[in-house]
């Protein structure tokens, strides 16, 4: 694996920081505060990334990996702030959030952003809640992904929502960051 700088980001309210806005009443009941992803993304882009780059020999091959709600944040960040991360790895992303709006709008977004580049890797294990919206995203990628975007969607029914990160992170990171 290529040398990387790994930054773990602790947050104080996971569901607030990892979720975007929602119009679904049931979504708003899962935590006292939701919908703070834009502010968390702003922190990463305007404070954390500049600090890391000023204090460490970082490259532009910036990436992000996460699962579940963090996977949702990663996919949303891919669409909301393209280019913030060159590599986005979302494992069992909670794309059911806001009635699956991110996945459902993906095809239209790709058509409007043909210059999008980078790498997007999505893997899913949970078939009933996660799978349907990941398949919608995959269909959008098949139909409309820009040619400069490298992408892969992988179904892993042998894993579970609780095991996918530990099983795949050690495999996917070296795959996305091979030795130079």
Regions from the PLM with identified roles:
Residues 1-180:
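Non-catalytic cap/lid and distal C-terminal segments of serine-dependent acyl enzymes
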